[in-house]
Amino acid sequence: MLSSRAQAARTAADKALQRFLRTGAAVRYKVMKNWGVIGGIAAALAAGIYVIWGPITERKKRRKGLVPGLVNLGNTCFMNSLLQGLSACPAFVKWLEEFTTQYSRDQQGPHTHQCLSLTLLSLLKALSCQEVTEEEVLDASCLLDVLRMYRWQISSFEEQDAHELFHVITSSLEDERDRQPRVTHLFDVHSLEQQSEMAPRQVTCHTRGSPHPTTNPWKSQHPFHGRLSSNMVCKHCEHQSPVRFDTFDSLSLSIPAATWGHPLTLDHCLHHFISSESVRDVVCDNCTKIEAKGTQNGEKVEHQRTTFVKQLKLGKLPQCLCIHLQRLSWSSQGTPLKRHEHVQFNEFLMMDFYKYRLLGHKPSQHGPKATESPGSALGVQDTQAAPKPGLSQPAAPKTQFFMNGACSPSLLPALPSPMAFPLPVAPDYSSSMYLFRLMAVVVHHGDMHSGHFVTYRRSPPSAKNPLSTSNQWLWISDDTVRKASLQEVLSSSAYLLFYERVLSRVQQQGREYRSEE
């Protein structure tokens, strides 16, 4: 029921309307014309106030415990997801900060162009909450402008790939590093005249030949840089060819064929990556020498061709490990298809089995031996505990390395693997020498022609303990950020996995033992 004041106002309004209707047509026209003029003036004033002072609403501030999102500039979710993943790797952000400092110091004169390293560092520090900002959404268009300067063409109307952008960034950073002045050749008289005179004690030697190639410190320190080792062994004489090392910035793993009812794990992909293959019709110098020794009167012996076994391993593991799961396949008709199989992965990754070791080389025995039970916690730098393993452990020593992707029963169902080696449900991480921790996961939703990239990443550490690692996970889709659980992360169909190396319990005890000596 209306109050007495409301009823009085309604009665007065009805009387005013009746008086207006009883007036003549000319009077009503003048009144309505004046109202139109007044309304137009009010609208103009409102528009002017909006232009000068902006909207009256306040800017939304970021909620506590979350990170800034990134605005989608038009099919730029691939870039936003990769930036969120890189910002969750503290070792890469720290290296990039040191790299930009050294690059700025080594450059002669002012910068004539915008540097990729400085632009990338500013974005990653803002996304990892290392810079003071309360904005909920950031703009990464500056990175696109810099990449176009590096002659990387990108269209807002085409779908792009996050893994391709990862290699564009790493190669562009390498090009930026190569711009620094190198050792001047003695025949380059013009450059020598421009250099300042050196003190006598700085001159160590002179040479007539070309200078020896110097090692690139950038490559040796880059956190994503690793080396693959490959060697070939003759099946006939068992002669081993020299080991060859090739560099990599990410491991691109193909997904093996799945068996119905059996889950695929990250170990299956890694084992398929390093599995040996036979190479036929290869000239073996050792077999040729053996055959030549058995001949008489120095008869010429043809080159002996045999079958070699090629073995691939990881010669050097990086500090930050990027794993790319190849989800592109081709049908029998030649059309591209996306593989949607779920590949199980763990929060911790053991790479001991896939590491290349020299013949006769044994792991270091310094420090006390591990006396903990299989359920001992990880001795990582932030004292975070590792998952507790189960009661049973595999008896064979080699089986302990195939543990990546066998999650806890509370997270994922433990089913028998389609390969010959067993996968324990809960591995023992305490004795691993090459242990990595999951930092971010990039997921692609959709098919090969269209889709969307999202990222799962760890929340930045608190200001009170900046060296720690947060257990809180975040789900990020461009400018949308929310909290997520570890179970949701491990259940996702990963496209890119970002791991960072940590110390196991045995390594931590060995470091403490050596410091006490």
From Swiss-Prot:
Domain annotation USP: ranges: 68-502
Cross-link (Glycyl lysine isopeptide (Lys-Gly) (interchain with G-Cter in ubiquitin)): K235, K289
Domain of life: Eukaryota
A single BP term in Gene Ontology: protein deubiquitination
Transmembrane segments: 36-56
Catalysed reactions listed for this entry: Thiol-dependent hydrolysis of ester, thioester, amide, peptide and isopeptide bonds formed by the C-terminal Gly of ubiquitin (a 76-residue protein attached to proteins as an intracellular targeting signal)
Main location: mitochondrion
EC number: 3.4.19.12
CDD domains in the cross-refs: Peptidase_C19F (cd02662)
Residues on Cytoplasmic side: 57-517
Pfam families, sorted: UCH (PF00443)
Gene Ontology cellular-component annotations: cytosol; mitochondrial outer membrane; mitochondrion; nucleus
Localization, UniProt: Mitochondrion outer membrane
Activity regulation annotation text: Inhibited by the diterpenoid derivative 15-oxospiramilactone (S3).
Region ranges (Disordered): 364-395
Topological domains, Mitochondrial intermembrane: 1-35
Family membership noted in the UniProt record: Belongs to the peptidase C19 family.
Protein task: Deubiquitinating enzyme tethered to the mitochondrial outer membrane that acts as a key inhibitor of mitophagy by counteracting the action of parkin (PRKN): hydrolyzes ubiquitin attached by parkin on target proteins, such as RHOT1/MIRO1 and TOMM20, thereby blocking parkin's ability to drive mitophagy. Preferentially cleaves 'Lys-6'- and 'Lys-11'-linked polyubiquitin chains, 2 types of linkage that participate in mitophagic signaling. Does not cleave efficiently polyubiquitin phosphorylated at 'Ser-65'.
Protein's name according to its UniProt entry: Ubiquitin carboxyl-terminal hydrolase 30
Gene designation: Usp30
